[in-house]
Amino acid sequence: MEGLVFLNALATRLLFLLHSLVGVWRVTEVKKEPRYWLLALLNLLLFLETALTLKFKRGRGYKWFSPAIFLYLISIVPSLWLLELHHETQYCSIQAEGTSQNTSRKEDFNQTLTSNEQTSRADDLIETAKVFVNNLSTVCEKVWTLGLHQTFLLMLIIGRWLLPIGGGITRDQLSQLLLMFVGTAADILEFTSETLEEQNVRNSPALVYAILVIWTWSMLQFPLDLAVQNVVCPVSVTERGFPSLFFCQYSADLWNIGISVFIQDGPFLVVRLILMTYFKVINQMLVFFAAKNFLVVVLQLYRLVVLALAVRASLRSQSEGLKGEHGCRAQTSESGPSQRDWQNESKEGLAIPLRGSPVTSDDSHHTP
């Protein structure tokens, strides 16, 4: 079991490393400057975290937070920023040109394979890999950027699944977290692909930066496990009042509401409303997802009110129960002594005449 945990921890971090290096390679291909390979140095933080986790935690995760996913975000997000900001090559050429290029690449690929039949098998594999890489480098840049976005979100979900769980989360809670991540990733991908496609957005560098900042901000929810962790509240919390009981009893729900309102749906709604009102970018999908974000925010706030009312009702019922219990005890303490006194007095009243006029056998048979 320990070996499997160790293997999962190491394999997941290697996948993060490879995907990050692919992103750095795309940046160097687009910018045509080898100095962008320095972005690969960000992976040194992931190397350090891997070594420390394998040595001190035996590959197991941490409670409430995943450093591996956070460092993976640090290593891949700058590459995606540079690819999105390099919008000069974001638009593909015409279909005819692309088709002719694909045909010529297929012919070159077949010729390469034919010429390599006379060489060794190792050389054949090397040449095939070179041709494959060359074909990848000629793919439309817009397709490459979208593909990196898609694989990035998939890596976050799969990596969170494969990483060993920490001590504060169960497998049932992990499955809930992964289901939440699937819906979140779909919304984030739609947000970036829908907004950055618009020509009006591309013509405004400030708006592009704002969208990328909101996108980066929304990614910070993936390293967190707080939205599914239930905290056991001690009995003393009830005596502290409403705030303590509210934040303790519904901590997971409050984190979920906060993430939705302040990290994802709330900021997404603001950006979409700005696009529709100020930049006059209106289409069917933009209106639909803006309405969806609005409904989610309203429903989350409604849920917050429902939870607050539930806690207040619980505290009120507990206080009424305590008052009723104290009242019963007070009535019992007041009525108890009088009843005992009455019983004692009745016993004494019956005993006095018996002591004052004792009955003897002679008196019982006396005749006047």
From Swiss-Prot:
Species, as recorded: Homo sapiens
Signal peptide: none
UniProt main location, coarse: membrane
Protein name: Transmembrane protein 26
Subcellular localization(s) per the UniProt record: Membrane
Residue spans crossing the bilayer: 4-24, 36-56, 65-85, 150-170, 177-197, 208-228, 257-277, 281-301
Residues carrying a glycan: N110
Keywords noted in UniProt: Glycoprotein, Membrane, Transmembrane, Transmembrane helix
Polar residues bias spans: 330-341
